[in-house]
């Protein structure tokens, strides 16, 4: 049966990203948020929110949900109003559309006929429906009706690592497979007005943005037709951290997605991440974490700061994660793929020798509900100028 499996590791062959056109400027967002939610009388809470926004290190975010949508659906701004139907009516349409835009960019970069796509993986925590966003995305793209689909709902911020793990397994165990994997999350599922009794809500309103990212994954790239690897997917792993239950979570209620984020998350991640690194890199003989490139989900500034401090990383190791956080906020599952895209583009622009900032080996980390950690060991490829 080995002849049915690919020879060699799977690689990322193309990357595409997409955001809604509507832009939220972080400096202006506290005034906007408290105005559109009719909460300007909550002056003390507004000042707390302004401080959260100021400390977020976010410059701007993209968001499909704009003021016109809120005028058409005024109940969305109420803190616990029964608005799930209205949110889902929007998101079951918009999530596949934004995902399709990212996929189209990845397919264009790949340069091959979309008829060669054999598998489609889609993840989103923003909506749930049957048939799912995978089906609608496939229809929008005009993929073959026989494309093999996998739909994963409610993974959250570690989903970017999950789609790479599953795409790798599919590509390596099905000779000739070309897997289109897409992540898309949108904040219309959790946007709501402020509450004095729920300060965690303010953090979510301050950091989350809308985005979609897609990759094409395959083994044995066919260079005769122009396929080129960007990163090899060497190994993958997933774990949930001890004593972390309830620190990150999301719960679908009549009022939409209710988000939990505990203040101990940065400490939990920073205290446990080296164990994940040792397990991943001991077989390769690497123990210097400054000798690898980093593609890290920027769940928030505090997470990056704590990990950098704990591992004694050089300040440039998270430059791509910090850039994506600044320009887009936390887009949940797609964010880490935005970071991957930023790293390979910056490596080319700065004349680095490899797609991984000049380093051969690297790691991708996603963090999310559980507290779950998803990691992928990557190998960069040389850049030929």
From Swiss-Prot:
Species whose genome carries this gene: Cannabis sativa (Hemp)
Recorded hits in PROSITE patterns, A to Z, give: CHALCONE_SYNTH
- Record keywords, A-Z: Acyltransferase, Cytoplasm, Transferase
The family annotation for this protein states: Belongs to the thiolase-like superfamily. Chalcone/stilbene synthases family.
Signal sequence extent: none
Molecular function, one GO term: acyltransferase activity, transferring groups other than amino-acyl groups
Q: Give an example GO biological process.
A: polyketide biosynthetic process
List the EC numbers from the record: 2.3.1.-
List the residue ranges forming a coiled coil, or say none. none
Q: Which GO terms describe its cellular component?
A: cytoplasm
Name the residues annotated as catalytic in the UniProt entry.
157
Q: Where in the cell is it found?
A: Cytoplasm
The record's function comment reads: Polyketide synthase responsible for the biosynthesis of secondary metabolites.
- Which organs or tissues contain this protein? Expressed in leaves and glandular trichomes.
Q: What is this protein called?
A: Polyketide synthase 2
